[in-house]
Regions:
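Polyanion-binding surfaces on beta-sheet-dominated domains and ring/shell assemblies
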Residues: 1-120
């Protein structure tokens, strides 16, 4: 399998927030993965704004949460679903994990890196 490359515009954003590629990303079997803190820094740097998350599914007893997050960057608007359950997270804080996943996906869409890089 061919190793995927990090898009140049994402490399530039990583550098703009004072991080190196090695600090901001890791390689998962040839697929670049970016850390959550790097995406948060990038979002803040370029001025991405988030609306209040919309909780779609909430079953605390089973540890399952799904929410929709919408973000804007100027006139660009993107949304994504974040989910957390015992099947995909060992953490005991499903609301925070669901929000983190949704925000990361929205940031990747807004910066044009969705499908090229994945979030942790």
């Amino acid at each position: 399998m061919k190793k995927r490359q990090i898009p140049q515009h994402l490399k530039d954003l990583i550098k703009a927030v004072g991080m190196s590629e090695q600090e901001a990303t890791w390689d998962c079997h040839g697929t670049p993965v970016i850390y959550h803190d790097a995406l948060e820094r990038i979002a803040s740097h370029i001025g991405i704004q988030f609306e209040k998350p919309d909780v779609i599914k909430n079953n605390v007893e089973e540890g399952f949460v799904a929410m929709c997050v919408t973000g804007t960057d100027g006139d660009k608007i993107e949304w994504s679903i974040g989910e957390a359950s015992p099947f995909n997270s060992k953490n005991s804080y499903p609301f925070a994990m669901s929000e983190k996943r949704a925000k990361d996906r929205v940031i990747l869409k807004l910066i044009g890196a969705s499908g090229f890089v994945y979030s942790e």
